[in-house]
């Protein structure tokens, strides 16, 4: 059952209408909440309420190649980071955009659709470094496989599922791009691999995409759309959740306050309230409900329920977008209408988000047993340079520096996989209507920018390759504004360029970190909020640290495992 309608924000907890009583209330229908709603409602005697702030996806969101256009729409919360000191300097007010999904499917309806699990070491560290039993790679692999329906070939069936709801596929890459970059990376000791979600992640490969036919796969299309007829699954759209109802004496969560159609409602939970509002909003909601750093809540006159480091330890991948390869080949020179026609025929460039072609996960030691330091994303550019600037929110004064020839250029984005820097999510005020303050604190640790620079150096070392010359290709000489005081192409010049043209990837993790100690963590290994009863968090905010890649696949796994943890607790496993 789906309850639609639109809300107008009005906040009051004193006069709320009764919305009903449910066994489980799930806040947020994104990568975590969508999976949970499906799996928990498999138990017919459980009555599940899924509260979503946005509405249903439309046909526009099905096209991965148009994903960036959703960032400034009602399908996103419209967030920016706070002004950064060491990154985002070419963005308006030094504030990178930080889109977070809003609507059924959450971020899975607006992201680039890339499917990356990470390196086995990532999950083994969850156990060995962060003290979370049950989350090693071998223990979570069955949950990656459970949701997956892998269609691409070749693949190793030991590592892949073939009957799950989430379809993973590859689309044909542009031959010239593959033929150029495969041998170029091979010269640097980086081999082509068929499947980075298989035995080895490190190498250069085609991207695996959340793609079914030519349409995006989201938690809406995979886990919700075909299950709305379940009488025990209640999906309510356009709800603005303002607070979790908590019995302060017993520290028990028993319901949720929210606004719908300008009316204040209260829904009661008999078993659990599960917060799956996303990497940013879950931390915001916990703090508004009195769970968070004692001093911060006191400063905002929010009554303290539980002192926990909510909002601390925020991490995000940061990427450098300033490297462009120019070739003498024409890739795509069509109008948008012509590209949409190609899309209908299952052809590029709109088949993938950001027109991604190839990916390389690389560690500098070339050791497959060690997780990568860097991700290289190789893409053809969007249909026009102005759209490139639009995607990243680049300040007008920097537009000319990124001078893209959209028909013949190749973008190479460099992601820092494992930053040492830690940021925070804090509240601007005690009002749910105020956007949270998101500070990823990029490059606060010098080691981060040094590692990213090493990633740049590796690509620069390709510039004299005969392979490039054979394609009439070269790395574009970008004139980075405000870096003229440094010797061109010197290390300091590149460090300056990185600070100006490094951007958010919107992979918000760890603000409600999972771990064994409530002094440094918010939830335990069973995703229960410390010191609280009947309250869990299941989304990217509980990941102990960033994984080696994008975060949708790990959150799907997390929610699959969380569903079994919950079923086991109530003997319904």
List each model region and its residues:
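N-terminal redox-cofactor-binding region of secreted/periplasmic oxidoreductases
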Residues: 1-573
């Amino acid at each position: 059952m789906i309850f639609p309608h639109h809300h107008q924000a009005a906040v009051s907890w004193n006069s709320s209408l009764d919305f009903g009583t449910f066994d489980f209330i799930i806040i947020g229908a994104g990568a975590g909440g969508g999976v949970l709603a499906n799996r928990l409602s498999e138990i017919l005697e459980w009555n599940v309420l899924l509260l979503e702030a946005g509405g249903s996806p439309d046909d526009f969101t099905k096209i991965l190649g148009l994903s960036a256009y959703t960032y400034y729409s009602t399908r996103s919360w419209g967030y920016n980071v706070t002004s950064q000191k060491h990154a985002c300097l070419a963005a308006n007010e030094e504030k990178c955009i930080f889109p977070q999904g809003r609507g059924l499917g959450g971020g899975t309806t607006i992201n680039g659709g890339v499917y990356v699990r990470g390196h086995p070491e990532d999950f083994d560290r969850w156990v060995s470094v962060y003290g979370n039993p049950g989350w090693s790679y071998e223990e979570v692999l069955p949950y990656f496989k459970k949701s997956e329906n892998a269609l691409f070939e070749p693949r190793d069936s030991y590592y892949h599922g073939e009957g799950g709801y989430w379809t993973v596929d590859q689309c044909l890459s542009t031959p010239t791009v593959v033929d150029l970059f495969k041998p170029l990376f091979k010269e640097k000791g980086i081999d082509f691999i068929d499947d980075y979600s298989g035995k080895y992640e490190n190498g250069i490969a085609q991207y695996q995409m959340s793609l079914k036919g030519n349409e995006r796969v989201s938690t809406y299309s995979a886990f919700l759309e075909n299950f709305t007829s379940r009488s025990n699954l209640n999906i309510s759209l356009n709800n603005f959740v303002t607070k979790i109802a908590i019995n302060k004496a017993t520290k028990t969560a028993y319901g949720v306050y929210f606004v719908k159609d300008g009316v204040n409602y209260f829904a009661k939970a008999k078993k659990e309230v599960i917060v799956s509002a996303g990497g940013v909003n879950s931390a915001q909601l916990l703090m508004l409900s009195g769970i968070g750093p004692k001093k911060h809540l006191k400063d905002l006159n929010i009554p303290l329920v539980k002192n926990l480091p909510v909002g601390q330890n925020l991490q995000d991948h940061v990427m450098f977008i300033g490297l462009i390869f120019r070739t003498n080949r024409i890739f795509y020179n069509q109008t948008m209408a012509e590209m949409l026609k190609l899309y209908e025929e299952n052809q590029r460039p709109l088949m993938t988000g950001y027109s991604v072609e190839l990916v390389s996960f690389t560690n500098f030691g070339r050791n497959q047993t060690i997780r990568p330091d860097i991700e290289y994303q190789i893409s053809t550019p969007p249909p026009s340079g102005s759209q490139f600037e639009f995607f990243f929110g680049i300040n007008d004064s920097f537009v000319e520096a990124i001078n893209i020839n959209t028909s013949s250029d190749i973008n190479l984005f460099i992601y820092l996989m494992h930053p040492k820097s830690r940021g925070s999510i804090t509240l601007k005020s005690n009002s749910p209507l105020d956007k949270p303050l998101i500070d990823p604190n990029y490059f606060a640790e010098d080691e981060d920018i040094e590692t990213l620079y090493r990633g740049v150096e590796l690509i620069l070392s390709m510039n004299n390759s005969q392979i490039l010359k054979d394609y009439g290709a070269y790395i574009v000489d970008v004139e980075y504004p405000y870096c003229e005081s440094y010797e061109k192409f010197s290390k300091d010049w590149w460090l300056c360029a990185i600070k100006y043209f490094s951007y958010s990837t919107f992979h918000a993790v760890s603000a409600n970190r999972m771990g064994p100690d409530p002094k440094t963590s918010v939830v335990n290994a069973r995703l229960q909020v410390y010191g609280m009863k009947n309250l869990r968090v299941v989304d990217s905010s509980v990941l102990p640290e960033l994984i080696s890649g994008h975060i949708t696949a790990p959150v799907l796994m997390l929610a699959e495992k969380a569903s079994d943890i919950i079923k086991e607790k109530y003997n319904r496993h």
